Amino acid sequence: MNNKTKYLVIFLSVVMVFGCKPEKKETEPEHPKNIIFLIGDGMGVSQIYAGMTANHGSLAMERFKHIGFIKTYSSDNYITDSAASGTAMSSGKKTKNGMIGMDPDTIALRSVLEIAEEHGLASGLVSTSAITHATPASFIAHQPNRNLYEEIAADFLKTEIDVFIGGGRDHFIKREDGRDLTKELEEKGYNILFDMDKISGITEGKLAGLTADKHNPRYSEGRGDMLQDATVTAMKILNNNNKGFFLMVEGSQIDWGGHDNDTEYIVEEVIDFDHAVAKALEFAQNDANTLVVVTADHETGGLGLNGGSFENGTVEGGYTTGDHTGVMVPVFAFGPGSEEFTGIYENTALFDKFLQAYGFSDN
């Protein structure tokens, strides 16, 4: 073999090795039965690293092997809000800031949660904010304005969602139209519970857990382990469906810490959110049929880290704004189909990747 031929063989070998996708493990299913989608509202790379530093150098999010980035802009603004970004991720379409589950022309969009229901899967939502707030609402409601909380609450009765846990009780009970949606939910077979200890004891059936009149308190003000406990409860209930489930879990208040330019608030909420991520990963590792995806709807605060100590768990942060920013945010994926979540892509692509993972052809 002459040198020219030898180099050609080496080149082609390298192309074949690096140009092909790695084969799936024999034990890994082609499609996951379950998808757990966790959203750290306002959580950019700096927020994650601040939480990691405050947690003495480690987070469960480090265990993900497939990582990408999404572009977050909305249809009418370089800087998205949670309504537009939540809608983009849940339905695969960019929309205007403030719109929930609708395109810019106010046409309702089917969400991945609704499509999962149509295929016979169980579905659930968990949030540390009101369950009617922009991010969870974008998976289940269709309203032209994110502030139409009572209308968003009423949209819950138009679906077959199995579990939802979060604040916002007043939007179901103390309504201008006089309706008591908790009674209507009871008639549809839901357990209606307001106490997290009682909520955590439910293992089957339909559950509406309304844990606060409005939003749940911040972690340091008494919320405790509500997020991870609610995540575990939702997974237990939804896993009773043999066809699988879709669950969205939101750590809402990372965003609020960013709006306040409060680094301590941010890191306590990131660490709390990471505890829920750890529970989802534990479930997925034991189950082997579950895809776990973690991302943010946007970054908040323009956080920069000016100093810190892993040993002491201290972080020094500086901010460029009290609002959202336009930077890309990371995506972490684990489980069957996780390799499809690497790279840089639009936030709308998450919807397509979820349907592809399930093996659903409808869009």
Identify the role of each PLM range.
Residues 1-8:
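Bacterial N-terminal signal peptides that target proteins for export
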Residues 17-19:
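C-terminal motif of bacterial Sec signal peptides marking the signal peptidase cleavage site
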Residues 45, 271-310:
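Metal-dependent active-site segment of extracytoplasmic phospho-/sulfohydrolases and closely related
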